[in-house]
C-alpha cells in the first residue's frame, strides 16, 4: 500500500462482516449500498460518494480495493450501484448522481488507460470477483507476462453501459451530457469489436 499515502480512512464504512471480514472492500461496499438504500438512502449515497473522495480515490483514478492491497482491481460496480441507489431513492437526487458520475469518469479513464495495455479493448484485471477459484494468482503475474481476461472485458462492457445509463438520466435534465452518452456508447462498441477480434478463449 506504499503508493497510497494520500489515503485517510477515518470514515464509518460498511464492512462485509463484523467477525470474519472486518475490513472494507470497495466492491462489496457498492453492493451493500443497494440494500441500504431501502432503509436509509442518505447513508447509502454517503457510502458510495465517500469511496470516490480524494482521501480514498487515488490521484490516478483507481479505487482502493481492500485494506491489505489497495492496488488490486475489483469489478467496477460503483456506477451500477449509484444508479440503483438513485432509482430506489425515487430518481430525484440529481446532485448525488451528477457528483458520482464526474468522479467515476476519472475511475473509468484509469481503467481504460491502465488496464487495456494493448489498446485493443480487451482488458486485463487481476482479482475480479472470483473468490478463491483462480488456478493462478492473477494479481501477481510474472514479469514479461500479461493476462487478457474475458471477465475483465465483460466488467468493462458492463461499466460502459452503466455510465451510459447515468449519462442518459443526466441528459434529461442537462443536454450537456448528451455527448457523454455517445462517448460510452462508442466505448461499448469498441469492446464488442475487441471481443470479436480477439476471442475470449485459448
Residue ranges, per PLM feature:
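Low-complexity, Ser/Thr/Pro/Gly-enriched N-terminal "stalk/linker" regions
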Residues: 1-21, 199-200
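Alpha-helical support elements that line or immediately flank enzyme active sites
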Residues: 25-51, 157, 167, 173
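Conserved hydrophobic/aromatic pocket- or pore-lining residues that grip, position, or stack substrates
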Residues: 1, 32, 78
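Active-site acid/base region of carbohydrate-active enzymes
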Residues: 1-4, 38-39, 51, 56-60, ...
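Solvent-exposed loop and edge beta-strand segments that line ligand/cofactor-binding
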Residues: 13-29, 63-75, 142-157
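Hydrophobic faces of stable alpha-helices that mediate helix-helix packing
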Residues: 48, 75, 79, 157-164
Amino acid at each position: 500500500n506504499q503508493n497510497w499515502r494520500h489515503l485517510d480512512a477515518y470514515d464509518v464504512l460498511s464492512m462485509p462482516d463484523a467477525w470474519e471480514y472486518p475490513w472494507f472492500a470497495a466492491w462489496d461496499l457498492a453492493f451493500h449500498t443497494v440494500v441500504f438504500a431501502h432503509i436509509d438512502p442518505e447513508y447509502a449515497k454517503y457510502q458510495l460518494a465517500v469511496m470516490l473522495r480524494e482521501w480514498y480515490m487515488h490521484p490516478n483514478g483507481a479505487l482502493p480495493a481492500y485494506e491489505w492491497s489497495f492496488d488490486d482491481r475489483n469489478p467496477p460496480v460503483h456506477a451500477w450501484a449509484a444508479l440503483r441507489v438513485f432509482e430506489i431513492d425515487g430518481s430525484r437526487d440529481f446532485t448525488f448522481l451528477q457528483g458520482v458520475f464526474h468522479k467515476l469518469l476519472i475511475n473509468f479513464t484509469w481503467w481504460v488507460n491502465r488496464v487495456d495495455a494493448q489498446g485493443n479493448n480487451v482488458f486485463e484485471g487481476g482479482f475480479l470477483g472470483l473468490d478463491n477459484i483462480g488456478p493462478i494468482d492473477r494479481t501477481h503475474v510474472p514479469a514479461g507476462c500479461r493476462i487478457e481476461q474475458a471477465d475483465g472485458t465483460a466488467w468493462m462492457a458492463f461499466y460502459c453501459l452503466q455510465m451510459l445509463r447515468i449519462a442518459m438520466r443526466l441528459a434529461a435534465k442537462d443536454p450537456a451530457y448528451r455527448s457523454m452518452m455517445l462517448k460510452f456508447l462508442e466505448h461499448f462498441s469498441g469492446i464488442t469489436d475487441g471481443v470479436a477480434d480477439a476471442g475470449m478463449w485459448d
